[in-house]
Regions:
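CBM-like carbohydrate-recognition segments
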Residues: 35-78, 90, 97, 106-132, ...
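Extended ligand-binding clefts on enzyme/binding-domain cores
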Residues: 187-188, 194-311, 315-329, 341-393
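Right-handed parallel beta-helix
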Residues: 517-518, 559-567, 631-641, 654-665, ...
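Extended ligand-binding groove/face enriched in aromatic
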Residues: 98, 108-245, 251-252, 382-384
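Short glycine/acidic-rich loop motifs that flank beta-strands on beta-rich extracellular proteins
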Residues: 490, 504-505, 524-526, 549, ...
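Bacterial N-terminal signal peptides
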Residues: 11-24
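Extracellular beta-rich repeat passengers
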Residues: 735, 753-882
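Extracellular "leader-to-stem" segments immediately downstream of a signal peptide or signal-anchor
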Residues: 28, 430-629, 634-637, 645, ...
């Protein structure tokens, strides 16, 4: 699949999926800290924050534009600005974010023109230089546009895009580095232009821009890679006319580490916008792996650092250089974190590299600030340098340029590196992306999901003072048992036979909360004790992040955790407490509604999460079990009753197994299992008898979901019984991050109260791409509405600007005995419903005509409908053009 066909129907939707990825999330400062180890006395994030503030102090306001000042719109300025913005978002440090934004925003005039670059109203325009080094500050402008929607920024972005549209090119389409460097492609230039162009293409729905980015990357690899060395040369001259260019190949004579760093950073950053599981993305990943292999191959074994001239080691005059070393660490760390590079292969080099940077390059300056030393100030090709020396690409030239401290070409990558190393060492990396085409991909998805195992150590809660009388508060005893188990390296925290009253339980890594047969954990729902029992934590509520009552069982950034056993979890909810907050009897607004409306408005407005505080005095009910930003999770065997709200709701988790449960709870909004922005999830052998959807796969609501921008993917549902609920398996409606790769098999769904078997619910306010959903061998008895429902007019319907997309859905060997309709599909102009396939199915007891509007291709193969009706393929809107 090409990028053009991939983005053909998703132009706006994909734009929105990441359009607010870097909005300021000041609430991150309020979150529990990740567990990255300290290196040289500080965590990687702390080193980045300290370096950022050191530079902010050193440079003051000199880099902000002002009349008569010396600040200029150029690439080092843009690199530093974007690094600060990224760090400000990741760390929640508002001062860093603000400084980074102002480095770009102060250049933008009221009319959207760019001071010192393009001010057409004053007849000042540098476009004729066609200098690709002038594009990088545009990345911060893209961020500001996503954050504010200010029309000035659209105009500024258009000026930058106009340059790229007119940029001179080589005969095969590669951007010239500058007008004064004709027919030349430099590794540096890939970072200067491509990340901006890729992000632009995604935000504004321009697949041709993304295709151009891939083309630039491929050309640079084709022309500059030396397979024997495993490295890319600094530059290539198509005409072989430059003094530095080899007359046969057009290549420069040496491998300069920083130029390789620019290229590698372009690869990992552009992959944020090019799907790594599509053909073009896979090719870019293959290039990244070659770059990474070269980085590892030429790492200095003594220090873990890298040399100015990459392959020349300790040749006289060569030196270990900080800007390239920082770039290389960033490339490896982000590549691992995003799943592009195998962790075990590259982690040792990355760790030694980062430790070497801190040990050998970071120095105190005597004023409480730190310096990044050993930075090559500048290097290029062609013309002469400030010393009158020819920039001929020779070894002697590269080692002759000045060595300084705190060059922004090193500071920026150092900030990026700290963010990614922090994430990596805190265990927040993603698994490798998986390309899914159909059921043939099922074994690969299943192989990624493995339940955690625990040491054979037991910690009985009764040993810590818990009493099985159903009246004495066991919360502290359970907390102590969990802490002891965790400190010992893991095991089981055992709840023995009897009833134990408790408040919120917070799990820690390597702890299995085991509820024995005959045991009940009764969660205290007495309103007067809710503030004490369920302290405010960072959570999601109906797809929007906030600070709210703790879920009954909660984990934050933990791994290898479980809730198991044959006992019972009783949430204690009733109309006298939790459920009463959303009791819709008598047609009156519920107490929950004002808080719900306020939270949703805060999410739309981008209010920092730490300011979205609910809990005591408010009426947003907690979910029952919510591991958050955790991995390797098992929930098995227990019976769950009387949940306040959603029952099982892992958020931003990876490798989750839900197995063998009996879920019987009929309160309002009692969804059974709602994986949200999760990867690699198995739900099997479970009974769902619920007051809302049995399973509802989610990925965040509206702008807040798009800000986080993480899809739910690689989800298997098998051997489950959906006895009661609104929908059997549902995608939505909090779905703005998207859903893909869902497999459903061998399930039974049968209840007059169960409205739909498979349901998609979305609208133009949520947006999101829902794709690759496969259902087979499912027996459906009676359902109230249809076997398949695709409702894109849910709630707000078409009244929004974020196109919902549903595509590549296959229903195979599915039977029903009493469904009014086979399908109910409600789309609208601009939305996409396409490639819906029924195969080898029998639907009996069908009473009403199918409802299909706003759909593309719907096909039937070997399908029987009784009473006898002829199935037919349906296209109510034309199929998308190729």
């Amino acid at each position: 699949m090409t990028l053009r066909s991939l983005y053909r129907d998703t132009a706006l939707a994909c734009a929105v999926l990441s359009a607010i990825t870097f909005l300021p999330v000041a609430a991150r400062a309020a979150e529990p800290a990740a567990t990255a180890p300290k290196i040289g006395g500080a965590t990687p994030m702390e080193w980045s924050i300290r370096m950022a503030r050191s530079e902010m102090d050193r440079r003051g306001d000199r880099m902000f534009f002002k009349e008569g000042g010396r600040a200029r719109w150029e690439y080092t300025h843009g690199l530093f600005s974007y690094a600060l913005v990224t760090l400000g978002v990741a760390s929640g440090q508002a001062d860093i974010l603000d400084y980074g934004e102002r480095l770009a925003s102060t250049f933008i005039t009221a009319d959207g023109e760019i001071e010192t670059y393009r001010v057409p109203s004053r007849k000042f325009d540098k476009i004729e230089e066609y200098n690709i080094d002038l594009i990088p500050p545009g990345r911060t402008i893209l961020h500001l546009y996503r954050k504010t929607g200010d029309e000035r920024y659209i105009k500024s972005i258009a000026l930058l895009k106009d340059q790229l549209d007119k940029q001179p090119r080589t005969s095969d389409g590669g951007f010239w580095h500058k007008q004064r460097y004709p027919y030349q492609m430099w590794l540096d230039g890939l970072y200067m232009g491509s990340p901006f162009l890729a992000e632009y293409g995604q935000i504004f729905g321009k697949p041709e821009a993304l295709e151009d980015v891939v083309h630039q990357i491929k050309l640079m690899d084709k022309h500059s890679y030396n397979a024997a060395k495993g490295l890319h040369y600094h530059a290539w001259d198509e005409k072989r006319a430059q003094d530095w260019a080899d007359k046969q190949t057009g290549l420069s004579p040496n491998f300069w580490s920083r130029s390789i760093g620019w290229y590698g950073m372009a690869l990992v950053d552009c992959l944020d916008y090019i799907p790594a599981t599509q053909e073009d993305g896979e090719f870019v990943v293959s290039i990244l792996r070659r770059v990474a292999d070269g980085i590892v191959r030429y790492q200095d074994p003594k220090t873990g650092l890298w040399w100015q001239v990459t392959d020349q080691g300790d040749r006289q005059g060569n030196y270990l250089e900080a800007t390239a070393s920082s770039m290389f660490v960033y490339i490896l760390a982000k590549g691992i974190n995003q799943g592009y590079l195998p962790r075990d292969t590259y982690l040792p080099a990355l760790q030694r590299g980062y430790e070497g940077i801190i040990r050998d390059f970071i120095r105190e300056d005597g004023k409480g600030r730190i310096d990044l030393t050993q930075c090559c100030e500048v290097a290029g090709l062609g013309y002469t340098n400030s010393k009158g020396m020819k920039r001929d690409g020779s070894f002697e030239y590269y080692i002759s340029e000045p060595i300084i401290s705190n060059d922004l070409k090193g500071v920026g990558p150092f900030l990026f590196a700290g963010i990614e190393v922090e994430k990596l060492l805190a265990g927040l990396s993603r698994p490798a992306p998986l390309r899914v085409t159909g059921w043939e991909s099922y074994p690969a998805v299943l192989a990624r999901i493995k339940a955690p195992e625990f040491p054979a150590r037991d910690f009985a809660i009764t040993d810590y003072g818990a009493k099985a009388d159903g009246q004495t508060d066991a919360t502290e005893a359970i907390r102590q048992a969990i802490a002891a188990c965790h400190a010992a390296g893991g095991g089981r925290v055992v709840v023995p036979k009897g009833t134990f009253l408790t408040g919120a339980i917070h799990l820690l890594s390597n702890v299995n909360l085991h509820v024995s047969e005959g045991a009940t954990l009764l969660f205290d729902a007495e309103p007067s004790r809710m503030a004490k029992n369920y302290p405010v934590v960072f959570t999601r509520w109906e797809g929007v992040e906030c600070m709210n009552f703790s879920p009954l069982i909660y984990a934050w950034e933990q791994e290898n955790i479980a809730v198991t056993g044959k006992g019972t979890l009783d949430g204690g909810a009733s109309n006298e407490n939790w459920w009463g907050w959303n009791n819709k009897a008598a047609g009156r607004p519920t107490r929950q509604v004002p808080d719900r409306d306020k939270l949703f408005a805060q999410g739309e407005q981008g209010v920092p999460v730490k300011e979205r505080v609910y809990g005591p005095g408010h009426y947003l009910r907690p979910n029952f079990i919510q591991p958050y930003r955790s991995r390797n999770i098992l929930i098995e065997g227990v019976t769950i009753l009387r949940s306040p709200m959603w029952i099982i709701n892992p958020v931003l988790c990876q490798n989750v197994t839900v197995r063998g449960l009996s879920i019987v709870t009929h309160g309002t909004n009692n969804d059974g299992c709602d994986p949200e922005s999760c990867q690699d999830v198995l739900i099997e052998d479970t009974l769902f008898d619920t007051g809302d959807d049995c399973i509802a796969i989610k990925s965040g609501r509206n702008n807040d979901g798009r800000r986080v921008g993480v899809a739910s993917e690689n989800i298997i549902v098998r051997n489950c019984t959906m006895k009661d609920g609104h929908g059997g398996v549902v995608l939505g409606s909090e779905i703005s991050g998207g859903v893909r790769n869902v497999f459903i098999e061998n399930c039974v769904m049968d209840s007059p109260e169960l409205d739909r078997g498979l349901r998609f619910k979305n609208n133009a306010v949520r947006g999101g791409v829902l794709e690759n959903v496969f259902m087979r061998n499912v027996k459906i008895g009676r359902v109230g509405e249809a076997v398949l429902t695709i409702d894109l007019l849910y709630e707000e319907g078409a009244k929004g600007s974020h196109k919902p997309i549903v595509r590549n859905v296959q229903i195979e060997n599915v039977t029903s005995t009493a469904s009014p309709r086979v399908m109910f599909i409600a789309g609208f102009e601009g939305a996409v419903v396409d490639n819906i396939r029924f195969k080898d199915c029998t639907f009996e007891g069908v009473e009403a005509a199918e409802v299909v509007s706003g759909a593309g291709s719907i096909s039937f193969e070997n399908v029987t409908i009784k009473p006898a009706r002829k199935p037919r393929s349906a296209n109510s809107v034309p199929a998308p053009a190729n």
